[in-house]
């Protein structure tokens, strides 16, 4: 079960310390993790990037694929088995959530898990006087920037949808000599992309969309990387 999430405060968490780790036990069973557009290039060097559709809202979210099956993360191990770690994983155990008394106001919350929290080793969150430490301020600033970038990512995805570039596809793969299918994923249609008028390409260049688009397309090659990781686990 997910660890409980509580608003971060000096009263409840004044003695808490964060023990930095590249173990990332909280994503051991995560097959996919969401991405922001700013990390497409780094992610594409090691992981496939696809889009998943929310069946209730119809909205698309870019994600990194970490495994071939539900509950499988091939990058999970004693140490993370990739040079790049998606930002949403790195921000753990912190997150921003709407405040209960004011849903329009975001508040910093912490996932109370034994994996990274303790009272003796690591980075303190508060001083003896109950003030935020420099470490906590840095984590808050990074998370705030990430939150801002989620809106830029939504704008990027909305543009792709507006131009009808995202299409559902079934990928036929071969892993360990066995044929597999990945269903329910969506990709940018390269033929539709190349058929766009010049003014659309100029607009994408102006907005900085071309780089993440091509990073996504190139990331399809990383299914071979996933297959190699799968071979090592069987």
Located regions from the model:
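Aromatic- and glycine-enriched beta-alpha-beta binding-site module
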Residues: 61-125
């Amino acid at each position: 079960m997910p660890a409980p999430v509580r608003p971060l405060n000096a009263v409840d968490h004044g003695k808490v310390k964060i023990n930095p780790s590249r173990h990332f036990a909280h994503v051991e069973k995560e097959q996919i993790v969401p991405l922001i557009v700013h990390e497409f290039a780094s992610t594409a060097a090691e992981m496939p990037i696809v889009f998943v559709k929310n069946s209730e809202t119809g909205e698309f979210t870019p994600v990194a694929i970490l495994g071939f099956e539900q509950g499988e993360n091939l990058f999970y191990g004693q140490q993370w088995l990739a040079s790049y770690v998606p930002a949403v994983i790195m921000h753990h155990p912190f997150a921003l959530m709407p405040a209960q008394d004011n849903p329009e106001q975001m508040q910093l919350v912490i996932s109370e898990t034994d994996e990274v929290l303790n009272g003796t080793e690591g980075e303190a969150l508060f001083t003896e006087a109950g003030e935020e430490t420099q470490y906590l301020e840095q984590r808050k600033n990074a998370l705030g920037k990430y939150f801002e970038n989620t809106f830029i990512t939504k704008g990027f995805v909305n543009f792709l949808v507006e131009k009808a570039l995202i299409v559902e596809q079934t990928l036929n793969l071969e892993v360990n000599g066995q044929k597999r299918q990945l269903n329910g994923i969506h990709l940018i249609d390269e033929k539709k992309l190349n058929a766009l008028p010049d003014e659309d390409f100029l607009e994408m260049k102006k907005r900085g969309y071309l780089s993440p688009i091509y990073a996504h397309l190139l990331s399809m090659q990383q299914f071979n990387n996933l297959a190699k990781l799968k071979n090592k686990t069987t």
